[in-house]
Amino acid sequence: MFVSEDLTVNEKNHLVIGKNDTVELAKEFGTPLYVLDEDLIRKNCRVYKNAMDKYYGGNGLVLYANKAFCSLFTCRLVKEEGLGIDVVSGGELYTAIKADFPMDKVYFHGNNKTADEIELAVKNKVGNIIVDNIYELEALNETAKKYGVVQNIMFRIKPGVDAHTHSFIQTGQIDSKFGVAPVSYTHLTLPTIA
C-alpha cells in the first residue's frame, strides 16, 4: 500500500516512516514512540522557504511553530534550514536558547506571558515579542528598561471579524481574549523606553 512518498506500508503490513519499519522501531525502543522523518521535515522546510524566496524576493521569514513539537532536535533542524521559530512559552523559548537558535529569528507569542518569561526573552534578545495587551506592554517596558534593551515588538490586533465558524475556535472577534482591540490602541500612548 502506498500512502505517500515518505510514508508507506510494507509487505508485512507495517507502517514505514522514512524507510524505517515502525513495528521494528517499537520492538527496539518500546512504545509510545515518536518517530520523525528528518528528510521529510527538511524537505518541507525547503518547500516553504523556497516559496517565500520566490514570491517575496527573500523579504520574509518562514516560522516553525514550536508548539507543534518542541525539542532540541526540531529547533536545531529548522535553524539549519534557515527558518525562524515561533515560541509561546518560557519552556519553548528555553529550548530554543539551549539549541543555540539565533535569537533575532525568534518570535515570542502568547496571550499570558509571565514576568519571568518576558525577562527571559528580553535578557536573551529575542527578535520580536508579540504584545497581546497593554499590561504586557507595560511589563515589557519595565523589563527592557532594566536591561537597557530597545525591544522589537508587534501587536496582536483583534480585527473585530466574525468568522462564522465554531465558537470554540473564533479568535478574531472584538471580545476575544487574544490581542488588543482597536478601541484600545487608538488611545494608546506608547511608553518611552529608556
Give the role of each language-model region.
Residues M1-I153, S167, D175, L188:
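A charged N-terminal "starter" segment
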Residues P182-Y185:
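Short, compositionally biased segments
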Residues N152-I153, I157-V180:
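Phosphate/diphosphate-binding glycine-rich loops and adjacent basic-rich segments that engage nucleotide
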Residues H187-A194:
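Single conserved hydrophobic/aromatic residue that forms the stacking wall/gate
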